[in-house]
């Protein structure tokens, strides 16, 4: 019995090798090309391709998961958040989370006139 682990990381980041019951599963790699020869019942993985703190979308989604999933659901169904039933739900969700406009302003999410698109004239 063995395990096959597929990693989408760059090849220079490490090699994943599995060895169980005296059989070596190298996924087409010759045994002399393997970097590691683990002991019995060992699975080694050297690198990680996913780092949650560096993913701002996921870190924000984990703060308010129900609001995030509701927004995703509304976006997938192309619902208008300004219509009455959804507008009430969004208002209640924002009030329940305790987020104020001042906190949003302090985070720098406010759009300034300098950052907004400017109108240009082409002759």
Curated annotation (Swiss-Prot):
Annotated keywords: Chloroplast, Plastid, Transit peptide
Query: Where's the transit peptide in this chain?
Result: 1-26
Region labeled Disordered — which residues?
97-123
* Top-level taxon of origin: Eukaryota
The reply to whether Isomerase figures as a keyword in the UniProt entry is: no
Report the InterPro entries cross-referenced here.
UPF0426
Question: In which residue ranges is the amino acid composition biased (Acidic residues)?
Answer: 100-123
Q: Where in the cell is it found?
A: Plastid, Chloroplast, Plastoglobule
For the keyword Plastid, the answer is: yes
The GO cellular component terms are:
plastoglobule
Principal location class? plastid
Q: Family, per the entry?
A: Belongs to the UPF0426 family.
Q: What is this protein called?
A: UPF0426 protein At1g28150, chloroplastic
Q: Which organism is it from?
A: Arabidopsis thaliana
